């Protein structure tokens, strides 16, 4: 067998000898994309994945259910490598484990006992992915056997780990080593026990073999062969940084020296790989380029792994997933495969199953919804302009010294671990990710850019903040203007986001800083202790208020928008030894800390999956200038006379509703609504009134008569019960019915039917249908069977609206299930109400009815 054939065969089995020459300088980041471009790219990526999946399925159907070819299967003894890669790509693209194509590929793999590192690794990864998705552990013995193979075939010299190679070859290489590590971690996630010593040896290996960049003291890289004299390898540097991240993730116990009783770490923020990882990330960011090495597609997959494992949205200054998607979709062929452009080199050129699988892994895994964003903050240095590191941020301490342990990131795996636990406990194993959110090098000089940034952050339903010391962006109480980070966090919460914060190691300076932040962005609001009746204690069993007596919360309008723990939690989240085997029966305080995170996430998300990455929320800008007399303008009734209430609940609901009507129904609307008490003499100017209720209604006779007069002269009142605990929800519901009975003694609220008594379509539904609004069914969370709370998940129901009719016209329309909080974007698993899309449809139909009638 010729050396060239061997090289091609091995490279095609995921990357042997994919070594780059000297890296090219990173290109400047592209200008921000327009809002419509974001939506277009989301659609393009989805279509591209669908076409790629079809291509792989069609290829397997023509090849007896697998993807092997003569070269890899017979000539280089790598049977199963291509099939495992294709199965992995299909599973990550949404194919079910029991689909005929995936089942056929898995059956093929189960018959094999591979003896090459790449194939053993890929077989392990494919079988582990299938096990996690199906929860069927039949392949666990085979996965465990593969772990034994890795442990047996690792190369050591003088007691030190040197990596993996091909059986019989005593010289290890970083490509084989990288895939051995991927296989080992996949096995661990599937449930195979791997001793911490092996992970520490791997950490030591990557730290020891990193080379110092002679051009930049802040950067370090890796080679393909540590014994060789070749230059830096970009692809192996990406693999080296991934190796450090994975080895740290594999450890059951970190080296932070955690006190399990208190949650305080004696060595908080100290990691043996801190410096090596920082140097590796610096090198990769400064030299970022997708078109590196002998296989660009292999490089795409490496970059995807690094971006996802590190949680970084930006590598250097490159928005890696967005930029990679834009490039990859252009490389897709009419048959759904992915191929190089005609003039591009590539050792895997002409092998579309390999290139297509790598492309799908990039597109699909990178698209994984972001559940939690970890908020980066603190002092920093920018790279020198004109130098290779101009796109890189260097962390520093408050005293100005450079640090590899920034105050916001003293725990490296806390966010990753709570997301993985929530994925298992709440979302039935659906793929989820986390990311670091770092705005510090972004150009946020205009309101439009700030709004765009908030729109991106909203793809993640939770923002997680923790650390040591005060956050420098929190301005003084005497400052009238909010800092840019304060503006972003305020708008994020107003648009439906949720804040989870924790004082790392119980740090009092951070606790005081976070409380000051909330006081700045929501004046008049204050953190309070979470009461025993709060829904987070009952989302899942296993914890109670006695376990976390100091836990704090902040309510705003419809619901709780922030949870803060002044006592340590992140130290437990950092270590997988506290990962509960049974989330309903935690054994110690560390396991209870994981269960608390689960319950908070369940509450904050309403147990709804986040939208895929790249999904951007377009914010409604504030209206500038005066309101034209011709514009339709809505009114919100503020019926609570309590002077401490600054605004009615769901105060942004009408703004979002008007923006929706302006876009979808082409109405000429005013985005700014009026807020008036029921007694206001101006009430008759507004023929659409909205009442969103949390507290019981007690209209005075004057207020009741004033509302009634408006209704009798063409007005319409839409009312709904806001998100609330079920006892308060029932109190409001009854108070509204009583108020309507006093207002209209001869009538009472009745269910609005879809048909009139003479069999015609009810005008409300007819007008909705004519406008293209489907009111046939909605997604709603109603009372549970016991009547003690809300259903755990949203369900599909017929629309449930009640009303009062005068002279053939509905003048009051009432939903006992929330509409306003949903339109604001709030999700809460204890809320009896609709999802946002359903709420917008219902409210839009009622507005159109009020205009047409």
Model-predicted segments: where are they?
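Structural recognition of the beta-strand scaffold that forms the well-ordered cores
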Residues: 88, 123-125, 150-151, 177, ...
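Internal amphipathic alpha-helical repeat/solenoid segments
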Residues: 56-82, 98-115, 440-451, 669-677
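Helical hinge/lid and interdomain linker segments adjacent to catalytic or ligand-binding clefts
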Residues: 101, 424-521, 539, 565, ...
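An acidic, glycine-rich "communication" segment
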Residues: 506-599, 603, 613-616, 628-633, ...
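Signal peptide processing junction and immediate N-terminal pro/mature segment
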Residues: 18-30
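An alpha-helical repeat/solenoid feature that recognizes helix-turn-helix modules
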Residues: 27-51, 66-101, 112-148, 152-200, ...
């Amino acid at each position: 067998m010729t050396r060239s054939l061997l090289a091609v065969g091995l490279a095609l089995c995921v990357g042997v000898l994919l070594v780059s020459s000297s890296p090219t300088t990173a290109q400047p980041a592209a200008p921000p994309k327009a809002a419509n471009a974001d939506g277009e790219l989301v659609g393009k990526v989805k279509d591209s994945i669908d076409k790629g999946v079809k291509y792989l399925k069609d290829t397997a159907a023509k090849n007896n259910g697998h993807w092997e070819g003569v070269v890899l299967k017979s000539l280089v003894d790598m049977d199963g490598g291509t099939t495992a890669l294709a199965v992995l790509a299909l599973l990550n693209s949404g194919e079910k484990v029991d689909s005929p194509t995936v089942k056929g590929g898995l059956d093929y793999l189960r018959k094999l006992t591979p003896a090459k590192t790449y194939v053993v690794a890929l077989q392990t990864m494919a079988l582990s992915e299938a096990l996690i998705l199906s929860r069927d552990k039949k392949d666990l013995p085979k996965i465990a056997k593969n772990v034994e193979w890795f442990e047996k075939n690792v190369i050591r010299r003088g007691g030190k780990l040197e990596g993996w190679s091909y059986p019989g070859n005593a010289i290890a290489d970083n490509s084989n080593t990288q895939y051995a590590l991927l296989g080992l971690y996949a096995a661990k996630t599937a449930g195979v026990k791997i001793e911490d010593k092996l992970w520490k040896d791997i950490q030591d290996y990557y730290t020891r073999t990193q080379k110092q960049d002679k051009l930049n003291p802040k950067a370090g890289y890796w080679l393909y062969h540590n014994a060789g004299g070749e230059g830096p390898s970009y692809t192996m540097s990406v693999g080296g940084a991934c190796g450090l991240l994975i080895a740290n993730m594999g450890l059951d116990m970190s080296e932070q020296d955690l006190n399990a009783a208190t949650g305080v770490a004696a060595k908080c923020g100290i990691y043996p790989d801190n410096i090596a990882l920082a140097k590796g990330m610096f090198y990769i960011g400064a030299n970022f380029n997708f078109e590196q090495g002998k296989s660009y597609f292999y490089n795409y997959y490496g970059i995807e792994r690094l971006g996802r494992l590190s949680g970084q949205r930006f590598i250097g200054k490159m928005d890696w997933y967005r930029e990679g998607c834009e490039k990859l979709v252009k490389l897709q062929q009419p048959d759904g495969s992915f191929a190089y452009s005609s003039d591009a080199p590539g050792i895997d050129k002409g092998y579309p199953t390999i290139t297509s699988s790598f492309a799908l892994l990039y597109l699909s895994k990178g698209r994984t919804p972001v559940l939690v964003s970890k908020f980066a903050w603190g002092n920093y240095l920018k790279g020198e302009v004109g130098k290779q590191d101009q796109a890189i941020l260097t962390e520093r301490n408050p005293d100005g010294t450079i640090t590899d342990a920034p105050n916001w990131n003293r725990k490296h795996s806390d966010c990753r671990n709570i997301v993985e636990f929530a994925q298992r406990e709440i979302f039935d194993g659906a793929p989820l990710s986390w990311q670091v959110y770092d705005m510090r090098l972004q150009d946020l000089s205009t309101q439009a850019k700030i709004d765009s940034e908030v729109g991106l952050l909203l793809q993640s339903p939770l923002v997680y903040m923790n650390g040591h010391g005060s956050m420098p962006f929190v301005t003084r109480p005497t400052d009238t203007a909010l800092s840019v980070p304060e503006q972003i966090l305020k708008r994020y919460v107003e648009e439906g986001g949720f804040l989870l914060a924790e004082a790392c190691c119980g740090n009092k300076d951070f606790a005081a800083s976070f409380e000051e932040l909330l006081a700045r962005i929501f004046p008049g609001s204050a953190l309070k202790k979470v009461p025993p009746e709060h829904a987070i204690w009952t989302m899942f069993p296993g914890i109670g208020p006695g376990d976390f007596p100091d836990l704090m919360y902040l309510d705003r309008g419809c619901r709780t928008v922030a949870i803060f723990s002044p006592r340590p939690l992140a130290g437990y989240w950092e270590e997988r030894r506290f990962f509960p085997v049974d989330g309903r029966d935690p054994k110690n305080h560390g396991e209870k800390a994981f269960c608390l995170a689960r319950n908070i996430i369940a509450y904050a998300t309403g147990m709804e999956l986040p939208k895929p990455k790249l999904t951007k929320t377009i914010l409604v800008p504030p209206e500038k200038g005066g309101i034209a007399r011709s514009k339709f303008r809505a009114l919100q009734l503020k019926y609570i006379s309590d002077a401490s209430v600054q605004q009615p609940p769901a105060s942004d609901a009408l703004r979002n509703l008007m923006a929706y009507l302006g876009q979808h129904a082409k109405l000429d609307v005013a985005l700014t609504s009026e807020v008036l008490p029921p007694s206001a003499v101006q009430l008759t100017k507004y023929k659409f009134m909205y009442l969103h209720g949390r507290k019981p209604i007690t209209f005075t006779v004057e207020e009741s008569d004033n509302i009634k007069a408006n209704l009798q002269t063409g007005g319409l009142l839409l009312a709904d019960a806001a998100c609330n605990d079920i006892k308060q929800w029932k109190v409001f519901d009854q108070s509204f019915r009583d108020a309507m009975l006093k207002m209209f003694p001869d009538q009472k609220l009745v269910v609005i039917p879809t048909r009139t008594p003479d069999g015609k379509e009810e005008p409300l539904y007819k007008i909705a249908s004519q406008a293209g609004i489907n009111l046939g069914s909605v997604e709603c969370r109603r009372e549970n069977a016991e009547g003690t709370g809300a259903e755990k998940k949203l369900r599909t129901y017929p629309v449930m609206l009640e009303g009062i009719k005068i002279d053939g016209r509905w003048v009051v329309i009432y939903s006992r299930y929330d509409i306003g909080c949903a339109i604001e974007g709030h999700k809460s698993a204890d809320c009896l109400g609709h999802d946002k899309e359903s709420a917008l449809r219902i409210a839009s139909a009622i507005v159109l009815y009020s205009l047409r009638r």
